[in-house]
Amino acid sequence: PEVTASERAYHLRKMKTRMKRVDVTGDGFISREDYELIAVRIAKIAKLSAEKAEETRQEFLRVADQLGLAPGVRISVEEAAVNATDSLLKMKAEEKAMAVIQSLIMYDCIDTDKDGYVSLPEFKAFLQAVGPDITDDKAITCFNTLDFNKNGQISRDEFLVTVNDFLFGLEETALANAFYGDLL
């Protein structure tokens, strides 16, 4: 089925939120520096050891590499959001599945203690690293939205369902408003 103008506008709003959140330097561009700074912020917020902080930094640099963000490369937030919407909305089923699976790199970045689950403190550190305006209460609400079975942790499966909804969903959902905080 053809994507309607309102569905496209909603999807673009999600991608703009994502890109604005990733632009932690606030310069209007997405760059490798942003991903490195997210890792530094998470390490500080989560009080990671030097070793864990470096592991987290390396994982975020892998995300930057996956996105083609070599040192010195930057793309405007607006262009990144439009490109993401354009490419995601025309993906075939197999490509969508691969995109969702590739997002597990981000899961591994957020799972700083490497126990295979994202805890509330880990998710909160990530959310507040990309959204310093996100309060503790909002972070908890977002976490609880993603923790479908209410066991106090976000599993890889729960994360994949959320990513699929965020990247490909065309209708407003609670999940979309929890992944990077409220849509901007």
UniProtKB/Swiss-Prot annotation:
> Entry's InterPro entries?
EF-hand-dom_pair (IPR011992), EF_Hand_1_Ca_BS (IPR018247), EF_hand_dom (IPR002048)
Tell me where the signal peptide lies.
none
Keyword list (alphabetical) reads: Calcium, Luminescence, Metal-binding, Photoprotein, Repeat
Per the UniProt entry, what are the Gene Ontology biological process annotations, in alphabetical order?
bioluminescence
EF-hand domain boundaries: 10-45, 46-81, 98-133, 134-169
What molecular function terms (GO) are annotated for this protein?
A: calcium ion binding
Q: What does this protein do?
A: This Ca(2+)-dependent protein binds to luciferin. The luciferin of LBP is capable of reacting with luciferase and O(2) only when calcium is bound.
Protein name as it appears in the record: Luciferin-binding protein
Q: Which organism is it from?
A: Renilla reniformis (Sea pansy)
